[in-house]
Amino acid sequence: KPDPAPRVIQTRSPVYHYRLGRYTRVIEHEIYKGLDGLFGGPTVMKGYNPDQVATHIVEAWNSFSDPVGIPLDASRFDQHCSIDALKWEHNQYRFLFPGERELSWLLKRQERNKGYGDYPGGQIKYQTVGCRMSGDMNTGLGNCLLMVCMMRAFCDHCKVKARLINNGDDCVLLVERDRLAHVTHECAPWFIRMGFNMKFEGDIAYRIEHITFCQLRPVRTPTGYTMVRDLKSIVKDAASLQPNIDGVYAWMGAVGECGLALAGDIPVYGAIYAAYCRHGSAGRVRNHNNFRNTGMAIASRGMNRFANGPVADITRVSYYLAFGISPTHQVIIENRFNELVAGSDASPFTLHHLPKGITI
């Protein structure tokens, strides 16, 4: 690829992260609240659970008479952060901490990055001007700040009423259907002038169940909408790297418990995670730091969908609209998982041993 955008994935020292985090972590969610005001409602979805995210999307969707959802993704956002973009972002932090020389010094280190790496034949040294160093304490905050403010400027440029659902470089823009053609025509060229490559990530959503945000879609339940993953993504939940069988059982119990909290009353998912719980063990893995910090554990906090009873007809229809699996096929899949018995030919797990010397 000729002259590709550089991607810097080396982390800085823990001391640097700690020193910068003392400033950015205390203002992060206050900045998110401030960004909400640019679009007239909750905009940055960081810190919300799936029920809350869905509630905010429904509220934004219902604020239009004939809405459409435009899925947008800034390709290689970190790599395309120019030094001008970083300086603008850093000035927002300096404004909140006037006179803090340490903060200014720390932020200055991000404008021109020097790094090195060892390889069998020697050592590589490099320098970048601009470019986000993936892993910096302000990566998520900075990306949200840049994206939301640019989207606000873009909507003002197009003179359109809009709501934004954002999580860094991943976002969905809601507008009236009659403004769709104008917005899609102007989007890519406008962002190119800003130094970013904005792409349409998937199909335009003409109904709420077709909105795709962070690989999730809204599904209606008797207690309101919740965000649900595509069934294909459950493959990631079905692979454990635990080195012994006891660890596998504990892992299954922990993932099953979190899964039921997230999707216990959702078609198919409830049956799958219930099978995990039946064959897993409670164990102490749920209290282990390595588990508490996983995506499943974080997403399930504050969720209690396993207490909402059996799958409702309205949920089956909404799930069908979102993912194309008919209610009949939903029941067939659920029955299959409900019949699984550990130790039989239909056991829910298989052990695979890696060749000697191979690690993951």
Regions found by a protein language model. Give the residues of each.
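Structural motif
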Residues: 3, 9-17, 242-253
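Conserved acidic
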Residues: 7-8, 12, 22-25, 82, ...
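Conserved polymerase palm-domain catalytic core
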Residues: 65-167, 172-181, 210
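Short, hydrophobic/amphipathic alpha-helical patches that form generic packing surfaces
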Residues: 14-29, 145-153, 253-264
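A generic structural motif
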Residues: 41-49, 99-111, 197-207
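Active-site and adjacent loop segments of nucleotide-processing enzymes
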Residues: 126, 130-133, 178-199, 204-360
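Active-site-proximal segment of RNA-dependent polymerases
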Residues: 8, 17-78, 139, 152
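Short helix/loop capping segments that flank catalytic or ligand/cofactor-binding pockets
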Residues: 6, 32, 79-82, 86-88, ...
